[in-house]
Amino acid sequence: MATNHLVLSGTITRSRSFKSPAGIAHSVIMLEHKSQCFEAEMLRNVYCQMQVIFSGERFESVTEQLKSGVDIEVQGFIALQQSRNGQNRLVLHAENVELKT
């Protein structure tokens, strides 16, 4: 079996919540990550933005707290998502979230 598990921390820059036609609650955020890591014995600045999707009842208790400016650590799996205009991007589907602020 292949492994697909990502842990990423950062600051929420955008958030929105909605229910699917099937009645499933979803929250979608944009997570901004900044850090420094060593690569080839050199310190490198790392920056990325990733869309994170929280789905289902288990996240309803934290949905109100997932607002712009909040620091979180999220664990989950990544998947390819195609937008309406046909562009592909990786998104993180949350399995666990920890509020840092």
Curated annotation (Swiss-Prot):
<comment type="subunit">
    <text>Homodimer. Interacts with PriA and DnaT. Component of the replication restart primosome. Primosome assembly occurs via a 'hand-off' mechanism. PriA binds to replication forks, subsequently PriB then DnaT bind; DnaT then displaces ssDNA to generate the helicase loading substrate.</text>
</comment>
<dbReference type="Pfam" id="PF22657">
    <property type="entry name" value="SSB_1"/>
</dbReference>
<dbReference type="InterPro" id="IPR023646">
    <property type="entry name" value="Prisomal_replication_PriB"/>
</dbReference>
<keyword id="KW-0639">Primosome</keyword>
<dbReference type="GO" id="GO:0006269">
    <property type="term" value="P:DNA replication, synthesis of primer"/>
</dbReference>
<keyword id="KW-0238">DNA-binding</keyword>
<feature type="domain" description="SSB">
    <location>
        <begin position="1"/>
        <end position="101"/>
    </location>
</feature>
<protein>
    <recommendedName>
        <fullName>Replication restart protein PriB</fullName>
    </recommendedName>
</protein>
<dbReference type="GO" id="GO:0003697">
    <property type="term" value="F:single-stranded DNA binding"/>
</dbReference>
<dbReference type="InterPro" id="IPR012340">
    <property type="entry name" value="NA-bd_OB-fold"/>
</dbReference>
<dbReference type="GO" id="GO:1990077">
    <property type="term" value="C:primosome complex"/>
</dbReference>
<keyword id="KW-0235">DNA replication</keyword>
<comment type="function">
    <text>Involved in the restart of stalled replication forks, which reloads the replicative helicase on sites other than the origin of replication; the PriA-PriB pathway is the major replication restart pathway. During primosome assembly it facilitates complex formation between PriA and DnaT on DNA; stabilizes PriA on DNA. Stimulates the DNA unwinding activity of PriA helicase.</text>
</comment>
<dbReference type="InterPro" id="IPR000424">
    <property type="entry name" value="Primosome_PriB/ssb"/>
</dbReference>
<comment type="similarity">
    <text>Belongs to the PriB family.</text>
</comment>
